[in-house]
Regions:
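Short His-centered aromatic/hydrophobic patch
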Residues: 82-87, 103
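A short helix/loop element that forms part of the nucleotide-sugar donor recognition site in Leloir-type
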Residues: 156-169, 292-293
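Short alpha-helical donor nucleotide-sugar binding micro-motif in glycosyltransferases
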Residues: 121, 220-225
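Short hydrophobic beta-strand element within catalytic cores of glycosyltransferases
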Residues: 241, 250-253
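Carbohydrate-associated surface elements
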Residues: 133, 149
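Conserved acidic donor-binding segment of nucleotide-sugar-dependent glycosyltransferases
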Residues: 265-277, 284-289
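Conserved donor-binding/catalytic core segment of Leloir-type glycosyltransferases
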Residues: 15, 141, 170-186, 192-195
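Aromatic "clamp/platform" in nucleotide-sugar-dependent glycosyltransferases that forms part
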Residues: 233
Length: 322
């Protein structure tokens, strides 16, 4: 198991470059990157973060590149870790510090962005991907499969009635939960159509859209709802599925990314077709299941601590090279 660095005479320093990171305006944007950073810091590693691009216009990458160069001139680093391809391009503008690039899934592998990913991958010292399929698509055979982990200390089961009381919700509805930013590729339209179809036979069902919520509040929503739904066109290894599993929340999802592998044969969790009729049918089955799942037992292998272990092993392999 990788060591912590608190007792080291010289502690290696890491710079994380990312286009996704939570802020006051977008508290749920890139929380999995923040969790990994905090996990590394908890092991004793000094980690600085540069946010480039993100939700701002594309020209903001130029400003981000300037801030990146200013930072590496002011501070010496032992490794630079970039999340997503555009951050990786910015980080590879320098050649003096080893670079790890984490590619985060199928959405990056489409069209010209996918071409850019495959172009960048050989220029990184180490690469992480979310799944074996993602590794094959990227075309780098020595890529490390490191799916984002779930914080099992934050995402814990609690009584549904207590969660609803804390949210001020009445207890006369069954609730379908969507978590995330409703961008077109998240297919909220499909979810809404499926819930509307289900309401013809189950009028007490409603859709809850949890957008713009602070990350620490998401477990409350998951424990207060009856089923999580995911309908994205593209995902790599969606953290929200693992978070729902950690809360023992039933799940209905399209077959995207590694969802089918993560939920496995967990009772109360269903993979549906990408149409409103089958999604409504599977939502009905999840609601009829009537209680919480055993998802937490299944997901323990994907705990955040294990992801941090894997990242540290990659860093150490770089630092041990002559």
């Amino acid at each position: 198991m990788p060591r912590s660095f608190g007792q080291s005479s010289r502690v290696p320093r890491v710079l994380v470059v990312t286009n996704m990171y939570p802020d006051d305006q977008n508290p749920d944007f890139g929380t999995f990157v923040q969790e990994q950073v905090e996990g590394l810091r908890a092991r004793g590693l000094p980690v600085d973060v540069i946010v480039v691009g993100g939700k701002r216009d594309k020209w903001s990458y130029i400003d981000g590149a300037r801030r990146f160069w200013r930072q590496i001139r002011q501070q010496e680093y032992d490794v630079i870790h970039a999340h997503y391809v555009f951050s990786g391009v910015v980080a590879r503008l320098q050649r003096g510090v080893p670079l790890v690039v984490s590619f985060h899934g199928a959405a990056e592998m489409v069209g010209w962005v996918g071409w850019l990913c495959r172009l960048l991958a050989p220029w990184a010292d180490e690469v992480t991907v979310t799944s074996a399929v993602h590794k094959r698509e990227l075309g780098r055979q020595d890529a490390h499969i490191v799916p984002c982990g779930v914080d099992l200390r934050l995402f814990v089961p609690m009584l549904r009635d207590e969660a609803r009381r804390r949210l001020g919700w009445p207890d006369d509805r069954r609730r379908v939960l969507f978590v995330g930013i409703p961008r077109p590729e998240k297919r909220l339209d499909l979810i809404q159509a499926a819930v509307a179809r289900l309401q013809h036979t189950e009028p007490g069902v409603e859709l809850v859209i949890a957008t713009g919520q602070a990350h620490h509040r998401i477990p409350l929503f998951m424990n207060a709802c009856d089923v999580l739904v995911l309908a994205s066109d593209q995902e790599g290894s969606p953290v929200v599925i693992k978070e729902a599993m950690a809360c023992n929340l039933p799940i209905v999802s399209v077959d995207v990314g590694d969802v089918a592998q993560v939920i496995g044969s967990t009772e109360g969790c269903f993979v549906c077709k990408r149409d409103s009729e089958d999604m409504a049918k599977k939502l009905g089955l999840a609601l009829a299941f009537g209680h919480r799942t055993q998802g937490r037992q299944v997901i323990e292998r994907l705990a955040l601590e294990k992801t941090v272990d894997a990242v540290l092993e990659i860093y150490e392999s770089i630092w041990q090279k002559p």
